[in-house]
A protein has these predicted regions:
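Solvent-exposed N-terminal domain segments of exported/luminal and surface proteins
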Residues: 2-158
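Extended beta-strand-rich segments in extracellular/periplasmic secretory proteins, especially
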Residues: 85, 95, 145-246
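Conserved small/polar residues in nucleotide/adenosyl-binding loops
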Residues: 247-253
């Protein structure tokens, strides 16, 4: 009986060692995929190009109320971007489709005379005016390979306007078939090298260059910088395939 117990204990010991080795080898590849319960909310504010803090008006935006005037104007502004990304269908063991709803809110503006204004919140009826605080609102949908996080082309579309009841979302969306770069999530096992980054505003893939390491809240991170070239956004097509022009003759006092 003693031999049996020793043999049993020896077997269990080997089994435990085997399990200790096999489980991580099995679990790690399974865990290194885009999770299907992904739900991320982020908030970011504009900062000057040099990254310094304290500037009240670090951005410059087009004065939409000047579109019908003889001369277009710009405004100094402070902006806040809010984004929520979740997983939607089609998603399975090979791919995950991310839906990212994003708004850019104008917190405050300053005109050429130095007058500061807090723009009004969007109106309840959804009718946008040229002086509204809502600058942009979009819903982006993109399918990615769960192992690499690279877009696979199954779904790649940008919704630019609300879809009324009975209207297919595709009818108010722009298809983005050539998207290749990372966007909402980097891949796994990131190296100190350049990667493609997809800039949704200009709808272009741009290189994101590794520039060094930074520590945030005690966590060591890699910093990547992407320089997006100046782009005429008015030439980008809308859902109807036409060049975008958000405002025509709206005035602030209408």
């Amino acid at each position: 009986m003693r031999r049996v117990w020793l043999a049993l204990l020896a077997f269990l010991g080997v089994a435990c060692i085997t399990a200790a080795i096999a489980i991580p080898a099995f679990l790690v590849p399974q865990l290194r995929v885009v999770p299907l319960d992904l739900d991320i909310t982020s908030v970011a504010s504009t900062v000057p190009a040099d990254g310094s803090a304290g500037e009240r008006f670090p951005a410059v935006i087009f004065d939409r109320c000047s579109v019908s005037q003889p001369k277009a104007r710009t405004l100094d502004a402070h902006l806040t971007q809010q984004r929520r990304s979740v997983i939607i269908e089609p998603s399975d063991k090979r791919q995950a489709t991310l839906q990212s709803a994003q708004t850019v809110q104008i917190d405050r503006i300053r005109d050429a005379d130095g007058k500061e204004t807090d723009p009004p919140a969007p109106r309840a009826d959804g009718d946008l005016k040229c002086d509204d605080g809502l600058l942009t609102a979009t819903i982006d949908r993109v399918s990615v390979n769960r192992k690499t996080s690279v877009p696979n082309g199954t779904v790649s579309a940008l919704q630019l306007e609300a879809a009324p009841e009975g209207v297919n979302v595709k009818d108010v969306s722009v298809q983005l078939p050539d998207r290749k770069g990372f966007q909402y999530k980097f891949g796994f096992n990131v190296k100190k090298r350049s990667y493609l980054y997809y800039d949704l505003n200009t709808r272009q893939d741009q290189p994101a260059k590794y520039v060094g390491e930074k520590t945030f809240n005690g966590v060591k991170t890699y910093e990547f910088v992407s320089e997006v070239p100046e782009t005429d956004l008015s030439s980008l097509p809308n859902a109807q395939g036409e060049a975008c022009l958000l405002y025509t003759s709206d005035a602030a006092d209408e």
